[in-house]
Amino acid sequence: MKLNRRDFIKANAAAAAISAAGLSVPGAAVAQGKDEIRWDKAACRFCGTGCGVLVGTQDGRVVATQGDPDAPVNRGLNCIKGYFLSKIMYGADRLKTPMLRMKDGKYDKNGEFTPISWTKAFDIMEEKAKATMKAKGPNGLAMFGSGQWTIWEGYAASKLMKAGFRTNNLDPNARHCMASAVAGFMRTFGIDEPMGCYDDIEHADAFVLWGSNMAEMHPILWTRITDRKLSNKGVKVAVLSTFEHRSYELADIPMIFTPQTDLAILNYIANYIIQNGKVNQAFVDKNVNFKKSATDIGYGLRPTHALEKNATSNGYPDADGKPKGDTGKSDPITFDEFKKFVSEYTVEKVSKLSGVAEKDLKALAELYADPKVKVISFWTMGFNQHTRGTWANNLCYNIHLLTGKISEPGNSPFSLTGQPSACGTAREVGTFSHRLPADMVVTNPEHRKHTEELWGLPEGTIPDKVGYHAVAMARALKDGKVNFYWQQCNNNMQAGPNINEELYPGWRKPENFIVVSDPYPTVSAMAADLILPTAMWVEKEGAYGNAERRTQFWRQQVKAPGEARSDLWQLMEFSKRFKVEEVWPAELVAKAPKLKGKTLFDVLYANGVVNKYKLNETAAGFDNDDSKLIGFYIQKGLFEEYASFGRGHGHDLAPFDSYHQARGLRWPVVGGKETLWRFREGYDPYVKKGEGVKFYGHKDGKAVIFALPYQPPAESPDKEFDMWLSTGRVLEHWHTGTMTRRVPELYKAFPDAVVFMHPDDAKARGLQRGMEVKVASRRGEIQLRVETRGRNKPPRGLVFIPFFDAGRLVNKLTLDATCPISKETDYKKCAVKVTKV
């Protein structure tokens, strides 16, 4: 059957309509003649919005992409990055063969990168990993993964590290972007991920953006908000940030606040709601508990830092070796105690602290307080990359819970994601150093036991100790605690904090062996010892999970160039190099004698569950190189085993094949029907008739409102370093620019990073627009041009620098302070000075 793009769209219209209702129908055949473009659906490779695209291939190459008009998320639209997806795989410097640092024919830490075979690459990885385990045990190994991994890549990595090598030293780069959202959800609701969905946009009367420049970072969702506002009189938009950006163009209530004072603003809103008698008392009485948390929790810096030495509840070892308190500890309080706690956050006090006018604070609070106004709160990195990021998430939930504006169309607190599968892979699969699939954690013995049973492993296989998180991994490499480190699908040497002091030294430490899997020679790759060339996006069969709990699949469309192989294949092949006796203690092997002599591949992947789907089940007319090389339908096997964790436990995923037929489905998918709103009767299958609202993540079915104070940041401007620095993204580039800077049109649109600065700050320093300047912190310095006009307009005393530019590494300047609960880095607040070169 031959289909052009128009015919393909028509043929799938019915499928899209039915799948939107949670049903599935057979997918259209899309086999093409040699001379025609073949079109097939995929999820966009960039942000967490999860736009649908149509991928056009011809002669083994992606030649075009289009917005998918049948995709519910974007309805045929793509942002500027999405329109150029067809070019991201074809940069001139695409890696096609493994590269090892060598000198005189041997590996040398200071040698030149030299092409080698995959066999030799795995030989040296095996040698270095085994030497590390012999010297340091399994915790000498670490892997840093990604919210860009496909679902099955993350799941395979989690099995390999946590069960195979028996270390929880696995963390995703989502630690840098979504960990605070995870911790916030778990503390307030006992279960992760948003209760609402994008359909909320078409029902809302007001939108509040907290530290989220949706106009540039989630532009397709922004078009839906814009349409809602311009098409419906009375719809309001409030925007809060530390500097003005493009989202302010639509704002009815624009607010610029002093960094960190969002905590105080959130408490003021709660106080306003209470003082004005706008608490939904019936909702609160039935559905909410109140708690007060530990507050002297430090800033996630090294234990020797002055800010950590005196902290009483940062969890670090005290002189007696015991942890100093618990960063997440909380105790019950009453509503009256909460009322008294927030009463100090008056409009006068908060206006003075934050710099936001009293009238704007009142207008914002009234949006939440008015029972007739449906409100969505959107946030991204402004909340999450915050030394009190977990608290910020909790405080926003407080407001929605006090008013009952939650879990129904148009009323939703909504944490947006920045990566295409930060939800689907990092969070749901559980590739964090403390997590297992379906919101389980490694410290819970019942969770470990359940996981071991599903994986067919002896009890005690999974260690009970939380592994190193992202920032701790860097410190462990520097300190010599980790000697073997494998990074896949991210560019942490550019994206991680405090590069000069905490990242680079560990990578170049002589005894450490660093492996980077990437399609391109990134900053990370060039700092590594071994580079593995990686297949990307539609060069493999994949699955992502977006910010609204929508799981989306795509088929392999083209082959990867040269010898490039997927992250999944790399994990599989590496696992074949180790027998259980080499990595497990004898007493563990003795519990399962049938596993003796088997490789980790045999035990984890060829285990009778993952390998039960045959090659003839893969899609006809499409390549599936991973499955062909491995010998069975690996993607289906991994997915179905993984899905067994969530089915019946509030994380239900549909059968594998249905995702290839639908434009994504939002979990929980029960009885073939997706869930749009969680926790409310009539929408959520886990809320029984008569229960109304039930936050079933907690055993008592209630959510928690937390009493949490405003606290200052870890570092603020002073006489020497007199300006705030905030980092982030721009519309044209994504993260570190690995893909977007290799698209000529995107590169030309914004070729180099600049320092956005208030004109008066520039003038006071004798600087002019376009002038080259030095921006320095206590940790490093970079040179770049001054920009006093354009899209980003900082207030006096603050500068903004995007992090996409490999030639201007802004993370040389940033501080490696984190939220002590979530361990997420604060990239939004440190002190710098700007001087003329």
From Swiss-Prot:
Q: How is the co-factor bound, per the entry?
A: Binds 1 [4Fe-4S] cluster. Binds 1 molybdenum-bis(molybdopterin guanine dinucleotide) (Mo-bis-MGD) cofactor per subunit.
Known Gene3D superfamilies for this protein? 2.40.40.20, 3.30.200.210, 3.40.50.740, Dimethylsulfoxide Reductase, domain 2
Output one GO BP term: nitrate assimilation
**Essential cofactor(s):** [4Fe-4S] cluster; Mo-bis(molybdopterin guanine dinucleotide)
EC number(s) stated in the UniProt entry for this protein: 1.9.6.1
What SUPFAM superfamilies would the database entry show? ADC-like, Formate dehydrogenase/DMSO reductase, domains 1-3
Question: Residue limits of the 4Fe-4S Mo/W bis-MGD-type domain?
Answer: 37-93
UniProt-listed SMART domains: Molybdop_Fe4S4
CDD domains recorded: MopB_CT_Nitrate-R-NapA-like (cd02791), MopB_Nitrate-R-NapA-like (cd02754)
Assembly and partners? Component of the periplasmic nitrate reductase NapAB complex composed of NapA and NapB.
By what name is this protein known? Answer: Periplasmic nitrate reductase
Task: Say which species the protein is native to.
Answer: Dechloromonas aromatica (strain RCB)
